[in-house]
Design a protein with these regions (language model features):
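Cleavable N-terminal export/targeting peptides
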Residues: 1-30, 272-273
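Outer-membrane beta-barrel "beta-signal"
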Residues: 57-61, 164, 258-273
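Transmembrane beta-strand segments of outer-membrane beta-barrel domains in Gram-negative
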Residues: 35, 41-47, 113, 211-253
Length: 273
């Protein structure tokens, strides 16, 4: 999971890494704040892999009031609309590349995969687009969020993500859970799951032309345990299934898995600037 810190998002799409933004804009401190931390994650070596790799991800976040935000997991964005019920604006992310030798996370500390050999490397990609978020229910406990992004560089596809998250407090502990789904265009699917004749000859897999459509769907959950007023430990996990266009690729059928599970633990400390 990719690196210009100013436009960063995890390659495998690890939304559970983020410490939940549980407070409405009216309760967010004015001015600049920063959060520093990290997370140890065990998950697929690459999207669709059945090999497990452990990675140590830095978690660096900068925000200005309830408007500007920048972090490795969530990218860089600006809330053009910001109220207790709605948030919306532009967003930019980066998707880390894929290395045919080992899977390619730049933060990998153990575990690797050699199942990509012969397919070639995929460069890092930038993704720019828009997001809309609606909070509702008692105490704004429910959050419905959607994003649409256009890729450039490593892939030139279009992605659309949607998630529904429920948050509740158990004493000082914040628990979040909910489903999510991702759609991708043919360009994206072909880049990561398609196999052209040259790749077929190099990797020993059948030629495959991937269609656009459902990329993945699944469930995620996180538990945030406050350590102090400005720091917390987060335990998180997710289980996802690849959609048919990805799962039907010979790469996944013969060398990967359509079920993708991730677990991790992180720590973050927030302070004003």
């Amino acid at each position: 999971m990719r690196l210009a810190l100013s436009v960063a998002v995890l390659a495998l799409g690890q939304p559970a890494l983020a410490l939940a933004q549980s407070r409405p804009p009216s309760e967010v401190p004015d001015g600049w704040t920063m959060q520093l931390g990290g997370a140890l994650i065990a998950g697929p070596a690459w999207q669709g892999s059945d090999d497990t790799a452990a990675s140590l991800f830095p978690d660096v976040r900068v925000s200005y009031g309830d408007r500007f935000f920048a972090s490795i997991p969530e990218g860089v964005g600006y809330n053009l609309v910001s109220s207790d019920a709605w948030r919306a604006g532009p967003i930019a992310k980066i998707r880390f590349g894929r290395d045919e030798e080992d899977g390619g996370s730049p933060f990998r500390i153990s575990g690797e995969s050699d199942e990509l050999r012969g397919l070639g490397d995929i460069d890092a990609a930038g993704e720019v687009g828009v997001f809309v978020e609606r909070r509702f229910g008692e105490g704004a406990a429910w959050r419905l969020r959607g994003e649409v992004r256009q890729g450039f560089g490593g892939h030139e596809g279009v992605l659309a993500d949607a998630s529904l998250t429920y948050q509740t407090r158990l004493g000082a502990t914040l628990v979040s859970m909910g489903p999510r789904v991702s759609l991708a265009s043919e360009d994206y699917m072909q880049t990561y799951f398609g196999i052209d004749p040259a790749q077929s000859a190099g990797a020993g897999l059948a030629v495959y032309s991937a269609d656009g459509g459902l990329l993945s769907y699944g469930l995620g959950a996180s538990v945030i345990l406050p350590v102090s007023r400005n720091s917390a430990v987060t335990v998180f996990g997710s289980v996802e299934r690849l959609g048919d266009a990805a799962a039907d690729s010979p790469l996944i059928r013969e060398r990967g898995s359509e079920t993708q599970a991730t677990i991790g633990i992180g720590y973050g400390f927030r302070f004003g600037l």
